[in-house]
Amino acid sequence: NYGYTFGSGTRLTVV
C-alpha cells in the first residue's frame, strides 16, 4: 500500500 513515481512519470503502486 505505497506508491512510487518514476522520473518519467510512470507510476508504480504496491499494496
Curated annotation (Swiss-Prot):
Keywords: Adaptive immunity, Cell membrane, Immunity, Membrane, Receptor, T cell receptor. Disulfide bonds: none annotated. GO terms for biological process: adaptive immune response. The keyword Flavoprotein does not apply. It is found in: Cell membrane. GO terms for cellular component: T cell receptor complex. Its main location: membrane. The keyword Thylakoid does not apply. Alpha-beta TR is a heterodimer composed of an alpha and beta chain; disulfide-linked. The alpha-beta TR is associated with the transmembrane signaling CD3 coreceptor proteins to form the TR-CD3 (TcR or TCR). The assembly of alpha-beta TR heterodimers with CD3 occurs in the endoplasmic reticulum where a single alpha-beta TR heterodimer associates with one CD3D-CD3E heterodimer, one CD3G-CD3E heterodimer and one CD247 homodimer forming a stable octameric structure. CD3D-CD3E and CD3G-CD3E heterodimers preferentially associate with TR alpha and TR beta chains, respectively. J region of the variable domain of T cell receptor (TR) beta chain that participates in the antigen recognition. Alpha-beta T cell receptors are antigen specific receptors which are essential to the immune response and are present on the cell surface of T lymphocytes. Recognize peptide-major histocompatibility (MH) (pMH) complexes that are displayed by antigen presenting cells (APC), a prerequisite for efficient T cell adaptive immunity against pathogens. This is T cell receptor beta joining 1-2.
